Amino acid sequence: MAPNGQPLAGFGDRLLAYLIDTAVAMAVMMALFLPVFFLVFFRMIDELEQAGPNGPDPAEVWTSVFLPLLAAELGVLLLMLVFYWVYHVEYARRTGQTLGKKVMKLRIVPVQPDAALSRGMLGKRWAVEFAGGMFVPFLSYLDGFWQLWDKPWQQCLHDKFAGTVVVKVGP
């Protein structure tokens, strides 16, 4: 039981909610990245068609294909971090739920029953789960599996850092 008396969310429910949220994020990412990818891809095909008998000039390929693709990937990465912030902090702040948590009938609540869920708490969750997970190898796995042995609140590392727990709000 959570400090507020609600039942704690189990690993399976949290994993399914995470997978639903990941599907939403992947749909957004594909909508952002595919047009850029096709633009660079067709540009690359055009470069190859214009190449002489010795093949394309490596410097030209580098500057007209690979650098724009790298810049596009960096841009998409930054947009995804912004999307994850909006989705997991701003959107979840209203009810303590993302779309995946709503579907699975889960809610993020503060460990302190008298505290309100704040942008700061959700921002800390985001920092550990997404920003930290980008830079520290295997942190995302360790973070998610942490709840399997955490007692008494079954918290993931991002929950511990933010002072939150995830509870079941429906049958």
Model-derived segments and spans:
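Transmembrane alpha-helical segments in integral membrane proteins
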Residues: 73-94
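Intrinsically disordered, low-complexity Pro/Gly-rich regions
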Residues: 1-4
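Membrane-interfacial segments
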Residues: 36-48, 94-95, 99, 103, ...
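Short, acidic, Ser/Thr-enriched surface-loop or helix-capping motifs
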Residues: 110-112
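Membrane-helix interface segments in multi-pass membrane proteins
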Residues: 30-80
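Juxtamembrane cytosolic face of transmembrane helices
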Residues: 6, 10, 16-17, 22, ...
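Transmembrane alpha-helix/helix-exit interface in multi-pass inner-membrane proteins
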Residues: 26-39, 85-88, 92
